[in-house]
């Protein structure tokens, strides 16, 4: 590299000075370049070529400047571009950006041209065949593994100014993605299976290039006779055809890539039904109650117990009925036993797989004896519910129209049930077919069928029992309709 940019000014504008095409990086088309400082998409005109640009010395290495080319006055050419920055590097492209020079020269800066040189080489190769009016550019189709030094030069009609050069070479290499394991949500807690069921775990992971995946069981290598593992580019599958309790434990997946690694642990628990309680004992029997005690099972099925189920059976019927479910203590009292019966009891253990296949049953029976009880009845005074008749709702006065049946109502309360008598103008009307008397649940009704003005008068309802005979009166007026 050299600080003199004048010998390369004409080289950067000449398309014939590039080396063999296979080694020249391809710049991004001008239509795809982000020109933050340019005034349009048009390319800047080429700088005026000096007569000395045709000198073969212009194609020599930057370290040997041409002696026949006069240098342009420093106040005419622009200064070096500012803030030359490498924005992005991938496996086949790179993007650089820069700021316009602080001093544009007396002629003014017209465009930028930039060039590259491979690490270890001495000749700068123009990247863009013509100067461009942009401050950012992307070069594509780069060879994997190459290293480049980059520089950018401001150009105007007076020539090229001093270049801005990147301090470090740019290495075109394959992008490495750190390995990462994505454990499915249902495997973040203990994965529970029953004995005999299959275990099929698919764990996705990320990493580029393809990482190496390996499994361990409780810190040891897997038993290839029981466990099958298949690892692909994006996931690893662990398969156990028929799980046994010995397969329980912590399985750890390790993904390694170029000195980086990621680990994920999965806890697997293989369970089965528990055994029955070790023993059961009938502690005591009193009244209609029986006390029981038992010992926990020797085999819990490789998991915690959810409790015990206690059942009772009458000796006469032999049918079992559940008394307690998922009961945690190992002692209980069974109540509400029927006097005169004999009972036996049994206890099951229960875990996530269900109840134990067998139960522990008491050897002796619990006899509920009938105690001798002498009844001593207390004196009882019978209550007198007798009540004289009383009208809770008297009969109301009414006005009726001739030819339309009307009804009189009242309600009476009495014990014993009273006899109801209806009267008109103090004369009994019992048995008269014109009147219909009904008494039901204390409600007394007198229906007068198609009354006429002759039926007007004072009606009386009398209730009679052994305790009294009160009466209530009302006035009925039957008015003839007006004629026109």
UniProtKB/Swiss-Prot annotation:
Transmembrane annotation, as ranges: none
Cite the Ig-like C2-type domain residue spans from the record: 179-267, 389-479
- UniProt biased composition (Low complexity): 41-71
Instruction: Report domain Fibronectin type-III positions.
Output: 80-175, 276-371
**Tissue expression:** Skeletal muscle.
Q: Which Pfam families match?
A: fn3 (PF00041), I-set (PF07679)
Look up the domain of life of the source: Eukaryota
Keywords recorded for this protein, A-Z:
Cell adhesion, Immunoglobulin domain, Muscle protein, Phosphoprotein, Repeat, Thick filament
- Its GO CC terms? M band; myosin filament
Query: What is the name of this protein?
Result: Myosin-binding protein H
Q: Which organism is it from?
A: Rattus norvegicus
Lineage of the organism: Eukaryota, Metazoa, Chordata, Craniata, Vertebrata
Encoding gene (name): Mybph
């Amino acid at each position: 590299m050299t600080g003199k940019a004048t010998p390369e000014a004409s080289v950067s504008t000449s398309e014939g000075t590039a080396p063999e095409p296979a080694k020249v990086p391809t710049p991004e088309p001008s239509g795809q370049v982000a020109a933050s400082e340019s005034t349009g998409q048009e390319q800047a005109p080429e700088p005026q070529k000096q007569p000395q640009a045709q000198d073969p010395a212009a194609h020599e290495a930057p370290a040997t400047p041409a002696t026949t080319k006069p240098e342009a006055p420093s106040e005419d050419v622009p200064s070096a571009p500012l803030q030359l920055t490498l924005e992005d590097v991938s496996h086949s492209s790179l993007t650089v950006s820069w700021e316009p020079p602080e001093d544009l020269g007396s002629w003014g800066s017209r465009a930028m041209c930039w060039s590259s040189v491979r690490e270890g080489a001495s000749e700068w190769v123009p990247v863009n065949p013509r100067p461009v009016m942009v401050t950012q550019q992307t070069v594509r189709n780069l060879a994997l593994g190459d290293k480049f030094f980059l520089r950018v030069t401001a150009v105007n009609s007076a020539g090229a100014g001093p270049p801005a050069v990147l301090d470090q070479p740019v290495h075109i290499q394959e992008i490495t993605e750190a390995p990462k394991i994505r454990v499915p949500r249902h495997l973040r807690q203990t994965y529970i299976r029953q004995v005999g069921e299959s275990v099929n775990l698919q764990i996705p992971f990320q990493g580029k290039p393809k990482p190496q995946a390996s499994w361990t069981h409780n810190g040891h290598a897997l038993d290839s006779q029981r466990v099958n593992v298949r690892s692909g580019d994006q996931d690893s599958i662990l398969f156990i055809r028929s799980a046994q309790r010995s397969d329980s434990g912590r399985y750890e997946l390790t993904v390694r890539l170029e000195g980086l690694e990621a680990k994920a642990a999965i806890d697997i628990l293989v369970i089965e039904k528990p055994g029955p309680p070790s023993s059961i004992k009938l502690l005591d029997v009193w009244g209609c109650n029986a006390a029981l005690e038992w010992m926990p099972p020797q085999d819990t099925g490789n998991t915690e117990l959810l409790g015990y189920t206690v059942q009772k059976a009458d000796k006469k019927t032999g049918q079992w009925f559940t008394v307690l479910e998922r009961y945690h203590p190992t002692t209980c009292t069974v109540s509400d036993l029927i006097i005169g019966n004999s009972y036996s009891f049994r206890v099951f253990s229960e875990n996530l797989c269900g109840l134990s296949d067998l139960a522990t049953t008491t050897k002796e029976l619990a006899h509920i004896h009938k105690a001798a009880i002498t009844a001593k009845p207390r004196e009882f005074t019978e209550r007198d519910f007798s009540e004289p008749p009383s009208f809770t709702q008297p009969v109301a006065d009414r006005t009726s129209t001739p030819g339309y049946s009307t009804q009189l109502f009242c309600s009476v309360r009495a014990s014993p049930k009273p006899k109801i008598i209806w009267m008109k103008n103090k004369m009994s009307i019992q048995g008269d077919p014109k009147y219909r008397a009904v008494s039901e649940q204390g409600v007394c009704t007198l229906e007068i069928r198609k009354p006429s003005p002759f039926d007007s008068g004072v009606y009386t309802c009398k209730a009679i029992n052994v305790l009294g005979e009160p009466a209530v009166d009302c006035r009925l007026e039957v008015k003839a309709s007006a004629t026109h």
